[in-house]
Amino acid sequence: MHLVRWLICLIQLWIQLGAAGSVTLLDPLLIEIPNGKLRGRDNGHYYSYEAIPYAEPPTGELRFEVPKPYKQQWTNTFDATQPPVLCMQWNQFINGTNKLLGVEDCLTVSVYRPKNSSRNNFPVVANLHGGAFMFGGPSQYGHENIMREGSVILVTIGYRLGPLGFVSTGDADLSGNFGLKDQRLALLWIKQNIASFGGEPENILVVGHSAGGASVHLQMLREDFSKVAKAAISFSGNSLDPWVIQQGLRGRAFELGRIVGCGQASDSVTLKKCLKSKPAIEIVSAVRSFLVFSYVPFTPFGPAIESPDAPEAFITHHPIDIIKRGKFSQVPWAVTYTTEDGGYNAALLLEKQASSGRELIVDLNDRWFDWAPYLLFYRDSMTTIKDMDDYSRKLRQEYLGDRRFSVESYWDVQRMFTDLLFKNSVTVSVDLHRKYGKSPVYAFVYDNPSEVGVGQILSGRNDVYFGTVHGDDVFLIFNVSFVPANRRPDEEIISRNFIKMLEYFALSTDDTMAYGDCVFQNNVGSKHMQLLSITRDGCENKQLNFFI
């Protein structure tokens, strides 16, 4: 009799678990989705299901096209134990002259599910990786920190990068934004399939850092974003940053064609056909020809404003115009920056040149008017060279006065980079959203320097104080290889608070957001900018005036 009761209870429990998804009691590694069955890996305190295709390979005739949903039916169990591959890229953080990484067939998602005996279902965090729209990948943003906390399912996404993902002639024939369209399809995949992994499709939070943060904002500017996500966070990147929506993309597209042997193309149709015939390695390796020095500008290929008649156009107006018209998804959004975000890419100016032994920053004294428009992304937005030179002169006077560029004046150069490339746009975007939006808008600034970060990596030195640079906050959420595994006690606390913040935001039933003991203040309806300051000592809500 007891055996019968036990079996009945077991069956009831199995039914309850089955109703929540396809994670079975007997074999949680075996998942069934519309394409068939897949098997993941048991990693001790979490399960992983990696490199699951969400789109057909963007190769051959599908190169430079809107991604097609993955339709293949698996006759055998799909092996989801292999790590995700990188999309083909010219990677800034590879030493040496050959910076080529990855493959063209790369449109996959990876799902990480914690083992947690206290819950069967989890809120979901979908991460769009950063990398200037040019490099990076899901495998470079580690999942161990989030899995350690055991409170959310994490999904990472691979999407096309560089010229393969963002080349554009500005018309319907080669519209661009293929990487953004990949992201969109992946988010739809998550919404439709995450319940099979024990995720809660009604509690999906989309986050991203740098270009990933800008991607999150661009995704949110589509009115249908609320169909795939509940809330969003843009860390140190949003669509109003000057390196996101750029002019001059059409010229770069045809220059790319000339470099790879499509110089005879005089129209978009011919150019596209020719580029499809070229090896992907040649197209991606051509990135080096668009760099003035080192990895400057860091985004030669990025998002474009598409023609309204482009196939499945992603964005057809400038983000500012979209926000002012109120034609964007009304979901809670948080946007952030670090106090010295401009350490990317300013720190590379402190690298000592092998030939002369002096820092690149010294060369700015003679090359400022040549390099500044590329470093700060106004090369294609000025009408005349005089306008460009006048602006370059104004910036130098504002931040350095009469001082020369040197190691001693580096801090002010970095401050310039922080303001122009990251910080100013946070104020502008929050101001616009509070005026023209309805859903809550939150903001925070992080000020707590890491022992090793982007500043040290780019400059190759540890004798300079960089402050809290680009990534110092996010790298406490997504562990990366160059950040020390042994974090300070204050960083451990902050890491846990950040991850708890993600869970809280994903689960919130009233659109509120909290970090530690601090509740974020909503900017909508506020006369002042509501900014949460996060430091090693805790958190504090501050009010600022809305001006640049």
Curated annotation (Swiss-Prot):
It is an enzyme of class 3 (hydrolase). The active site is at 210 (acyl-ester intermediate). Coiled coil: none annotated. Keywords: Disulfide bond, Glycoprotein, Hydrolase, Secreted, Serine esterase, Signal. GO terms for cellular component: extracellular region. InterPro entries: AB_hydrolase_fold, CarbesteraseB, Carboxylesterase_B_AS, Carboxylesterase_B_CS. Its main location: secreted. This is Esterase-5A. It comes from Drosophila persimilis. The lineage of its organism: Eukaryota, Metazoa, Ecdysozoa, Arthropoda, Hexapoda.
